[in-house]
Amino acid sequence: MFNIDLFEKNLKTEKIGKKNYYYASTCSTNNDIWNIFKKNKKAGIVVIANEQNGGRGRGNNKWYSKKNKSLICSFLIKQKFSNEQLGLHAILVPLGIVKGIKETIGKNLNLKWPNDIIYNNKKIGGVLIESKNIDNTIYL
């Protein structure tokens, strides 16, 4: 089971993880993060769940997780970039996640474009990037 205290103790970041929220079960970490942001208007927050029963994928696809078998998280950042650079996040974020997992656990993961994380020819995860323009600032 995920340990939020251990996570926060070992988190070494400047922007992401300033405030973390953990839920044993949730409908969608993405929905949670936008709802939290509406209240406090601060970027750098992370939402982590042990189980998700209404996650979204591309299009109308649903993403379900098994309790104690998945890492489900969303983070929200505020960045200054042009509309042309916005598309780079769709490439760089999944690449960074796969690289980080490879370096941490030493498993050979791959990326099936645009957002599927593959291990042993099976999809084990996905990356969903949502952006919103709020008060002329882009949040991801």
What positions do the PLM features span?
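Acidic (Asp/Glu) carboxylate-rich active-site/surface patches
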Residues: K99-N136
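N-terminal lobe of the biotin/lipoate ligase/transferase fold
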Residues: M1-E103
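Alpha-helix termini
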Residues: N68-S70, I134, Y139
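Structural motif
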Residues: K19-N20, G44-V46, N110, G125-G126, ...
